Each structure stands twice: as C-alpha cells, then as structure tokens.
C-alpha cells in the first residue's frame, strides 16, 4: 500500500458522489494535515488515525479518485490551508 493508494482510498470513501471540488477538498485536508506538526507526517498515517476519516484498506478506489489524488498540486486551495 503506497501513499497514493492511501490518498485515493480516503478521497473515494469520503467524497464519492461529490462534485470534483468536494473530492479535491478532502485531498487537500489530508495534505494540510501531513504538513502540520499536529499530525503524523505521512499520508497513510494521517488517514489511518482513529475517528478522522473513512478509511478501509479493503476498498478499491475508483480511477477518478486516483486522478484527483495525482492532480492535487495543480488545483487552487479550497480549504484555506
């Protein structure tokens, strides 16, 4: 399980059915937490924290969730982080 997989899974589980902006926002929240000293410094560690995100390693994210995860650096900040 790689970092991209962890990010795509949480985007898929938290924001499937949401418009693209909602999916981007979920990814940005995760990345903001990775950058914060208050949270672990890896994507997988952030999304695996108890009671923070819907995260389940047995789920397979959609291709669209991978696309959102890969494209995060190219989107404007939607969450103020």
Language-model region placement:
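Bacterial extracytoplasmic/cell-wall-associated proteins, especially those involved in peptidoglycan
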Residues: 1-81
């Amino acid at each position: 399980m790689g970092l991209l997989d962890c990010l795509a899974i949480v985007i898929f589980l938290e924001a499937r059915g949401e418009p693209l902006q909602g999916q981007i926002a979920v990814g940005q929240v995760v990345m903001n937490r990775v950058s914060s000293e208050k949270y672990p410094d890896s994507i997988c560690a952030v999304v695996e924290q108890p009671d923070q995100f819907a995260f389940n390693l047995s789920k397979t994210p959609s291709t669209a969730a991978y696309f959102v995860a890969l494209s995060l650096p190219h989107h404007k900040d939607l969450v103020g982080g």
